[in-house]
Amino acid sequence: MTKAMEELLTSNLFVQQVKKLYKVGELLGLDLDTLEALSQPERVIQVKIQIRGSDGKLKTFMGWRSQHNSALGPYKGGVRYSPNVTQDEVIALSMIMTWKNSLLLLPYGGGKGGIRVDPKKLTLKELEDLSRKYVQLIHNYLGSDVDIPAPDINTNPQTMAWFLDEYIKITGEVDFAVFTGKPSELGGIGVRLYSTGLGVATIAREAANKFIGGIEGSRVIIQGFGNVGSFTAKFLNEMGAKIIGVSDIGGGVISDDGIDVNKALEVVQSTGSVVNYPEGKKVTNEELLTSDCDILIPAAVENVINKFNAPKVKAKLIVEGANGPLTADADEIIKQRGIVVIPDILANAGGVVGSYVEWANNKSGGIISDEEAKKLIIDRMTNAFNALYEFHKRKFADQDLRTVAMALAVDRVVRAMKARGLL
């Protein structure tokens, strides 16, 4: 089989997630009927979105919302705008959200949405029309106790503001808790902007303390310098880590002397890509992933570490800032090489923890300061890591942390489904 064919077969995120689920199912002793129930979403909504472009021509886009599991509470997960969105990807990401919310003991199930669109090719008015039309088509399946969307790739607080306004217009329900990641004027909280990066950095610090002698002076490479990657870099830098490599879709840069995170952000704002950072060595994303470092944080897209480049990874610790950045085959190779992996369902859960704080605040009508919210996120992430670490050491020391994290998450969902008579 050719390398191209191998890459094609391992690129489907849904297939990879089902493989991981069945591996955990064997560990927990789950029967095939239960695994089948867990591997399929409860509902997938597919919509055809048509808007009139600024040129007067009709534009058509496909959109989805996957509602994977609601045993523990309403569906919760982001909505992404990307030309690469597929139904399988959205389903897989909603499954990951189920495990993530369960692991963090949040009162949510898993959901995810997406529209297949290149937002860079749309005007601001076209983006607004697209966003409003999406809510028009799926509003019957949303609600603060039903399904609560949030920002994801290429969506932001403004997108959530459009979503919320359209939802209120259609339903007549002035319920700001239906969406999270909103502007502060609409019940959003400031920390939601950087809560995912804060969570990744917190988990990286805790993992470094346990596995590689501490975060102070650790050499860190981050693939992806968008919201998650840039804030992760900022917080790790404040914690004493040394950021030696960063990249985005345009490529990356490595500097053994360390990268000035604020300067890198200025370069991105002025030139469009961190690859234009004036110091250090220019590298491709592939080269960045296999460069020498203590901590590697893939914070871009899924499946970037596969069976072909996993043998070349030089990091001692991998912290998954993105969803599903390692294929199942890469997982096995990395495990055999003794590299510790902190899985996505824990590492990047700061975003949904931030969303939970916002949602709970909206539901209660309370007021919370950014410092209080930040502390809640750090404490929740730290406690979740410590619980996983102790459980792993006590019960499943022969298993990798991803398997144990998923085992904890899946077991809680299964117990909830059994209690409700769903299994």
Swiss-Prot record:
GO terms for molecular function: glutamate dehydrogenase (NAD+) activity; glutamate dehydrogenase (NADP+) activity. It holds the Pfam family ELFV_dehydrog_N. Its EC number is 1.4.1.4. The active site is at K112. Keywords: NADP, Oxidoreductase. It catalyses: L-glutamate + NADP(+) + H2O = 2-oxoglutarate + NH4(+) + NADPH + H(+). It comes from the Archaea. GO terms for biological process: glutamate catabolic process. It is an enzyme of class 1 (oxidoreductase). Belongs to the Glu/Leu/Phe/Val dehydrogenases family. Homohexamer. This is NADP-specific glutamate dehydrogenase.
